[in-house]
A protein has these predicted regions:
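ATP-binding N-lobe of GHMP and related small-molecule kinases
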Residues: 1-127, 131-147, 152, 166, ...
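ATP-dependent small-molecule kinase catalytic core of the GHMP/sugar-kinase superfamily
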Residues: 36, 143-226
Length: 226
């Protein structure tokens, strides 16, 4: 992902103006407590998503290229699609961002999405995608949102647009967390503390190969039960 400017230029015939990244996470303590307002203790992983953006001055369309899928999609509305899941997250971010900033001019964009986060493995690839997109939009439009507010907007995307009744943990640690530190979060008040991890500790993350997709699982049902 170090050659994102070359790839951006090859796809859109221009250089990007802004780029941001967001990382995947693993939760050490606190499953199901984030969306019930409890305490959690996640930390960042090395896997990340990078989103690069520039204004599209050639046409009145949004153009997005996702390197993992090797797929380019163009659109000019924010209607949720039925068969292109990754583009829904981008549309949702744009919808929430413009809804939050109703006085902004509708500027069409070119966006490059690059990621090495394993998908559907329960390490929050979707939250990292939303956070990276929103941070790039925040910089592009020079809004000045704090990282905590970016996390809140990312949660709105997943809840109000995508339709997953998740908590705030994933978005908060992806937006604010620091490598090498655990992220203690009170999910009710959103107060947090960065905690040093002991140097002599080693955490192993094991892939069960069970694919996870909250939109198609009983996640929302479990959320409502609690």
């Amino acid at each position: 992902m170090n050659n994102n400017n070359k790839i951006f230029n090859n796809i859109f015939q221009q250089s990007y103006s802004h780029a941001n990244e967001a990382h995947a996470r693993v939760n050490l303590i606190g499953e199901h407590t984030d969306y019930t307002g409890g305490y959690v203790l996640p930390c960042l992983l090395q896997y990340k998503t990078v989103v690069s953006v520039a204004e599209n001055k050639k046409s009145k369309t949004y153009n997005a290229y996702y390197e993992f899928y090797r797929e380019k999609i163009s659109f000019n509305d924010f209607i949720k699609s039925k068969n292109k899941q990754w583009i829904d997250y981008l549309k949702g971010c744009l919808f929430v961002f413009y809804d939050e900033n109703k006085t902004l001019d509708n500027i069409y964009l070119n966006l490059l999405i690059q990621s090495n986060i394993p998908m559907r493995r329960g390490i929050s690839s979707s939250s990292a995608l939303c956070v990276a997109i929103l941070k790039s939009l925040n910089d592009f439009f020079n809004i000045g949102y704090a990282d905590k507010h970016i996390a809140i907007l990312a949660q709105k995307v997943e809840r109000n647009y995508i339709g997953v009744s998740g908590g705030i943990m994933d978005q908060m640690v992806s937006s604010i967390g620091i490598h090498g530190k655990a992220f203690f979060l009170d999910c009710l008040t959103l107060k947090y503390e960065l905690i040093n991890l002991p140097n002599n500790y080693c955490f192993e993350l094991v892939d069960s190969e069970v694919q996870r997709e909250n939109r198609k699982s009983a996640y929302n049902e479990r959320h409502n039960q609690l």
